[in-house]
Amino acid sequence: MVPVFAHLTCSSTSQVLQTLDTSQSNRLFSNCPQGAMTPGIPIFSPMMPYGTGLTPQPIQNTNSLSILEEQQRQQQQQQQQQQQQQQQQQQQAAVAAVQQSTSQQATQGPSGQTPQLFHSQTLTTAPLPGTTPLYPSPMTPMTPITPATPASESSGIVPQLQNIVSTVNLGCKLDLKTIALRARNAEYNPKRFAAVIMRIREPRTTALIFSSGKMVCTGAKSEEQSRLAARKYARVVQKLGFPAKFLDFKIQNMVGSCDVKFPIRLEGLVLTHQQFSSYEPELFPGLIYRMIKPRIVLLIFVSGKVVLTGAKVRAEIYEAFENIYPILKGFRKTT
Amino acid sequence: MASTSRLDALPRVTCPNHPDAILVEDYRAGDMICPECGLVVGDRVIDVGSEWRTFSNDKATKDPSRVGDSQNPLLSDGDLSTMIGKGTGAASFDEFGNSKYQNRRTMSSSDRAMMNAFKEITTMADRINLPRNIVDRTNNLFKQVYEQKSLKGRANDAIASACLYIACRQEGVPRTFKEICAVSRISKKEIGRCFKLILKALETSVDLITTGDFMSRFCSNLCLPKQVQMAATHIARKAVELDLVPGRSPISVAEAAIYMASQASAEKRTQKEIGDIAGVADVTIRQSYRLIYPRAPDLFPTDFKFDTPVDKLPQL
């Protein structure tokens, strides 16, 4: 079965992402309703398949980065739906006379007349809808635009963020003793460590507050939560009487984890990727893989669990996982 | 007695009749002889043997050798300096009996740390009876690391221990970290850290350890006969092939295999004994043993003589 879609791996360039971005947003709002109205011609799945109860999701996050991720993830979900749909529809293919276009954009109004095969990742300049071939079979391979490694689908697994470490400068010198005495949930042991350790319950985080006014906030599960928690700590310090500001908030480290759901042959992996891997069962049961691009350290375990750390932005974690997934699939344990 | 023939890169002397013949050196007589016709081509060749033979029970102060210790050219930076010896006559001592000229220090200040480390390496290797080739390899590794200066902040002993570990691995006879810990004052954690740093600094890598690397050493430390050792090797290898012990350290698997083999033979060993020898906790052996116990009949070699049959093996 020829995979009809050219699949986008997350290591594609940002340009690709941006063009996808714009085209996708167009499609979101133009393709769906009109395609449904055309009678008599069976419709290949547009962006939102009917009957699944899905509606185009409005973009919620304030972070511009996460918009990209959201869309990537949406694409991945849709691809899976696509493939399911495609399998169903190939059975009906003999009956259907389908007009197929090599790309699906031309997303302007009249596009609704020609139901277009949804192709999530082609970026060629769209031929005009009128020039679609008349007798395509569903098995006609699309011209892959992004070079796809054979049989590489995006894994469909999304690493979950487990910890975010961020720093912020409160901009004034602090008296740790008064903070420790007056604030709740604060501990200060100057002989052991020269900072106040403060905890808040929502979001569940811990902060180290130093006398220079700098603060480290750990334990949050998302960038927004980390920022919110840091602001809460700054407010606590402010309420204690210090002229606290919120300068240079920066996320220093992000940790994510996921499960590839199959056991992995670590010995094979260390043999082939010697310059990146370090596997010493005497020292640590997992393989430590230092990826160069993006610069992420992955801990890979025999059970199939993977921990990714060292990222400054969420996209690096996703990209690193998409890079490692085909490699791990190659070292799947067969028994 | 003819010594080994030297292959001259620039043949300065050749036999006039046989220019292609490789001359044989007879160092006792100081001759270079053509093997084809027996012509003595070069004579009065300087004897490079030692001038005197010294024995340990001779008066040690009267060592007539004028050349000193053998050089260590690969390691120290060429030891061609000389030292002023201790005085022998009465004039060299002042009124209190102290020698007047006391400068025997700072002979190689740049290499002092390195020589100290070599001494330490030799001591450590001696404790676990490592052969000279491993010690030489360790010295070489240490010299490379020391000259690179990328690990300059680390304790020299830690780097020396890690070099010893890497040398054992490279020679194909790995020692466990715990064994190196036992002869060194450095903690396992620090040795592990230095090990990873050295591999990165020298841009080398080492092979993965396998269960068979340790079998002969552990079994002979436990005084187990050869059949038990071979059986244990077979069990451990089969267990890894059948993937009964995913994610377990090869040491633990080897230990469990030794336990199973010894319990099935006449020479039984307890988990505690095996754990003491290998530096593995006996709960670890128990865990690995539980994983291989269900497939015990498949793991034994076919020609093994059971003293205790397979179904009577202890089940923990």
Curated annotation (Swiss-Prot), chain B:
Acetylated. Autoacetylated; autoacetylation at Lys-238 stimulates transcription activation. It is an enzyme of class 2 (transferase). The modification N6-acetyllysine is found at K238. It holds the Pfam family TFIIB. It catalyses: L-lysyl-[protein] + acetyl-CoA = N(6)-acetyl-L-lysyl-[protein] + CoA + H(+). Its main location: nucleus. GO terms for molecular function: acetyltransferase activity; histone acetyltransferase activity; promoter-specific chromatin binding; RNA polymerase II complex binding; RNA polymerase II core promoter sequence-specific DNA binding; RNA polymerase II general transcription initiation factor activity; TBP-class protein binding; zinc ion binding. Sequence repeats lie at residues 124-200, 218-294. Residues 189-193, 249-252, 283-286 are annotated as: Core promoter DNA-binding. The keyword Protein biosynthesis does not apply. Keywords: Acetylation, Acyltransferase, Chromosome, DNA-binding, Metal-binding, Nucleus, Phosphoprotein, Repeat, Transcription, Transcription regulation, Transferase, Zinc, Zinc-finger. It comes from the Eukaryota. General transcription factor that plays a role in transcription initiation by RNA polymerase II (Pol II). Involved in the pre-initiation complex (PIC) formation and Pol II recruitment at promoter DNA. Together with the TATA box-bound TBP forms the core initiation complex and provides a bridge between TBP and the Pol II-TFIIF complex. Released from the PIC early following the onset of transcription during the initiation and elongation transition and reassociates with TBP during the next transcription cycle. Associates with chromatin to core promoter-specific regions. Found in a ternary complex with TATA box-bound TBP. Part of a TFIID-containing RNA polymerase II pre-initiation complex (PIC) that is composed of TBP and at least GTF2A1, GTF2A2, GTF2E1, GTF2E2, GTF2F1, GTF2H2, GTF2H3, GTF2H4, GTF2H5, GTF2B, TCEA1, ERCC2, ERCC3, TAF1, TAF2, TAF3, TAF4, TAF5, TAF6, TAF7, TAF8, TAF9, TAF10, TAF11, TAF12 and TAF13. Associates with TFIID-TFIIA (DA complex) to form TFIID-TFIIA-TFIIB (DAB complex), which is then recognized by RNA polymerase II (Pol II). Found in a RNA polymerase II initiation complex. PANTHER family: TRANSCRIPTION INITIATION FACTOR IIB, TRANSCRIPTION INITIATION FACTOR IIB-RELATED. The TFIIB-type zinc-binding domain is necessary for the interaction and recruitment of RNA polymerase II to the core promoter, the formation of a fully competent pre-initiation complex (PIC) assembly and basal transcription initiation. The C-terminus is necessary and sufficient for interaction with the TATA box-bound TBP complex and for the formation of PIC. This is Transcription initiation factor IIB. The gene is GTF2B.
